[in-house]
């Protein structure tokens, strides 16, 4: 799935490209891609560190979204097949 498809699926209105939901969805796609890369290259520690930073950033955004809009938070977790 490319970036434009992800943005179209999670945007709130037509010109929305940077809302929290879109950012979380894009980060999730990058995290999944990098996870696959690390399965094939287990000693790539630089990429592993980048992955950890992305996971932390996504966690912070999810925490913010949970406070700001709990309903959207639940929908996003469902669509992205994340925890809880």
Curated annotation (Swiss-Prot):
The organism's superkingdom is given as Bacteria
Q: What molecular function does GO assign, one term?
A: structural constituent of ribosome
The record, for PROSITE patterns, names:
RIBOSOMAL_S15 (PS00362)
Does Ribosomal protein count among this protein's keywords? yes
GO CC annotation terms, alphabetical? cytosolic small ribosomal subunit
Name the GO terms of the biological process aspect: translation
Write out the entry's keywords from A to Z: Ribonucleoprotein, Ribosomal protein, RNA-binding, rRNA-binding
Q: Can you say what this protein is called?
A: Small ribosomal subunit protein uS15
Q: Please name the InterPro entries in this protein's record.
A: Ribosomal_uS15, Ribosomal_uS15_bac-type, uS15_NS1_RNA-bd_sf
Annotated transmembrane regions? none
Q: Which Pfam families match?
A: Ribosomal_S15 (PF00312)
User: What's this protein's function?
Assistant: One of the primary rRNA binding proteins, it binds directly to 16S rRNA where it helps nucleate assembly of the platform of the 30S subunit by binding and bridging several RNA helices of the 16S rRNA.
Alphabetized PANTHER family for the sequence: RIBOSOMAL PROTEIN S15, BACTERIAL AND ORGANELLAR, SMALL RIBOSOMAL SUBUNIT PROTEIN US15M
Keyword Translocase listed? The answer is no
| Organism per entry | Fervidobacterium nodosum (strain ATCC 35602 / DSM 5306 / Rt17-B1)
